[in-house]
Amino acid sequence: MTKFRTESDLIGDLQVPADAYYGVQTQRAIENFRITGTKMGDYPAFVKAIGYVKLAAAQTNHALGLLPDTLLKPISEACKEVIAGKFDSQFLVDMIQGGAGTSVNMNANEVIANRALELMGYEKGDYLHCSPNDHVNQSQSTNDAYPTTVKLAVIMMNKTLIEKLQLLIKAFRKKGQEFADVIKMGRTQLQDAVPMTLGQEFEAFAANLEEEIARLQSNANLFLEINMGGTAIGTGLNAPKGYAKLCAENLAKLTGDAFVTAANLVEATPDTGSYVIYSSALKRMAV
């Protein structure tokens, strides 16, 4: 028989599975957004990325004197476990949900907070000691943490894609050498045209993919500009001075990617141009 614990928010009390690392906000989202059946935990790159974002935020808040030593260690450890994939099964919010990612952000905040509580010897849901909002989500908003997470996830997935394309290029090169002396007819306008080697055809495939890799990498670099520290609408309300720059630096150190703070956070917060441009590279590669 499933056991439950009671958690509360501004709406009221709600039963949450006792062994769940998520909390009341996630439980409400699970009940409210039964749309696709595909959960955010089905995207390990996203979960890993949000773990990095929350870890960078915790380090930044600690450096600026907002997060005490007693919370930095357990929150950091919880974030690292999220990054390692230990809690993918706890990210149960539907991939399509209202609020521009608020439910997913809270899913992460609650999982990290409850794991931190556990590490400190407290019961899950005892948010007086470690709060999903006041501590894990400190100096953040869904509107900067969520898009930064998506950008990092795409960067990681782009690297994986490029690795696979490089393997395909290597295979094409090998075939190019293998069939270097095999003559075939080249075709134009659906008709035989002039002779070529089968090896030349495979070499052309390889060259084409090399161009696609260059375009993918160039376009993915646009995701390195983030709006952490902009909070809700880019004005930086509730984030301390210096937070944006330091958070980007911390995220860069953690991931090895050269993240920088956007020049204008108000503009950057709603901007989706980088996704459009990167999508064009994916479409070109597919064609």
Feature locations, PLM:
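Conserved, well-structured ligand/cofactor-binding cores
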Residues: 1-287
